[in-house]
Amino acid sequence: QQKAIRFWLFEKGNPDHIIGTMSIQRISRGIFQSCVIGYKMDAAYRDMGYMTEALHFLISFIFTELKLHRIEAYVNPDNNASIHLLKKLEFTEEGIAHGSAWIQGVWQDHLRFALISGPKS
């Protein structure tokens, strides 16, 4: 059974206004101890640092509370803002996942990024 955790991001001071979401998906235990994250921010709230702040929380939650070892994120190669965000958060680009997402009737490639818990080598 697929397990996932979703977080809703609210505008500060306005808990009725959702401005974004984050999710932890494909949580794998056993030998892998990994997950995949997804995130989305309302266009009006981009470039304000909110998603950076939220993902710092999410990364800490995954490594500290869930005690996972590896976080993966898949990004459309044209999504420069998301690529920049992941690199700022010290994710490493690992390559291309060819034909990994069925979007608008077409199998599309995505870049795979990963972050490993513990000290960076």
What do these predicted ranges mean?
Residues 6-121:
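Acyl-donor (CoA/ACP) binding surface of acyl/acetyltransferases
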Residues 1-4:
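Active-site rim helix/loop that mediates acceptor-substrate recognition in acyltransferases
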